[in-house]
Amino acid sequence: MLGSKFEARNRTGSAYYLSPKELKKFGYTDISRMLRAVPGVNIYEEDGYGLRPNISLRGTKAERSERISLMEDGILAAPAPYAAPAAYYFPNVARMYAIEVLKGSSQVQYGPFTTGGAVNMVSTPIPKSFQAGLRTSYGSFGTFNTYAHLGSDHKHVGYLVEYLRYQSKGFKKDEPNERTGFYRNDVVGKLRIHSDEDAEIRQALELKLGFSNEHSDESYVGLSEQDFASRPYYRYRGAQMDQLQTRHTQTALTHLIAFTGGLKVTTSAYYNYFWRNWYKLNDVRIGNQKGEKRSIEEILADPETNARYIDILTGTTDRLGEALMLRANQRSYHSRGIQTKVEYRLPFLSSYLQLEAGARYHADLEDRFQHDDSYSIEGGKMSLFRAGQPGSQSNRITTAHAFASYLLGKWS
């Protein structure tokens, strides 16, 4: 969308470009740290690794970055940008080439959240000659990151293959063997067929395929104020089964045709699929009656009144019956569309008039298929008491269809 610092500086509205040189210099794997240098961006941390960042542009709601447009290579990347915009999936920035941030009027052609802005992640381009590389780092808490790529371009055919592995043992532990870490895998492949660069009518067709997955022993359960003050990295025993599993695939086919007279047309068709199941603690029971169940929010807001629930949550009190209620928040997302952009540079007097017109049809869907399981707890160890019926909790399908278009003009 921008492509350089120069384009960002000369953009209408506010735009910022994090160049490949800057990303390479700091070597971050967390988008939260990358965006700290960008004015007008507010972020609050959640897991400490940037797996699911909460980004706000110009004061918009930060939770799950659901009020900004998240894109990869100019294509909407959130699981369901219109039907369910909460970004439980976020592209792995450790494999990105550059980051572009647009706020307010500078991003009207990207939508759907034109009030806040857009964050576009530019993936690694196909190299013009043979390139291969390997980058590895290791840090505290068994945090490991490795990235490998291989690509080249021969006459009229280019290709690129990338692999990323990102993992950590985590730092929220009650005992040494407790699982609180995560791992991520990400594979991306590109194939490009193109004409000669100096052809009278230059054309290119690029296919991009991607697959990624994640397993993280992450929990929604926090701490009471007293526990946070005394042991901020503590994790309650009632959250030991909490985990998130995800799978994501992406397909994009992009065609470019450029004429010598200054006319260029870029068209992309895309499809993204995302599946997640966040298996997490919802409620705690001290008995079988309706009034003997409390949500985690209620318990931690008033731990003194809910002392019996806290004892079960922390594992200091055994309960052999139905004690801990976990919900499998299983959801699948489908996102697809086609978009085209026409650019024309017209000489006028002693300057140029740059015209840009674009249109996009987009459709997405969220399908919820959830259930609850109940666990007992004894000696600080949880065991399954009763398995729930798949699809027995808060199921629904949400769909959205959208058409957007724009026309921009600029003197230069």
What is each model feature region?
Residues 32-79:
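Extracytoplasmic beta-strand/coil segments of soluble accessory domains associated
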Residues 198-206, 246-412:
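Face-selective signature of the C-terminal outer-membrane beta-barrel domain
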Residues 84, 131-135, 171-179, 183-184, ...:
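Extracellular loop and loop/strand-boundary signature of outer-membrane beta-barrel proteins
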Residues 23, 35, 99-100, 119-121, ...:
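Non-catalytic regulatory/gating segments with a bias toward low-complexity or hydrophobic composition
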Residues 6, 77, 124, 139-141, ...:
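Structural signature of outer-membrane beta-barrel domains
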Residues 75-103:
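Short acidic/polar hinge/loop motifs at secondary-structure boundaries
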Residues 1-24:
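Short, acidic, small-residue-rich periplasmic hinge/interaction motif at the N-terminus
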Residues 131, 138-167, 175-219, 243-247, ...:
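Transmembrane beta-barrel wall of Gram-negative outer-membrane proteins
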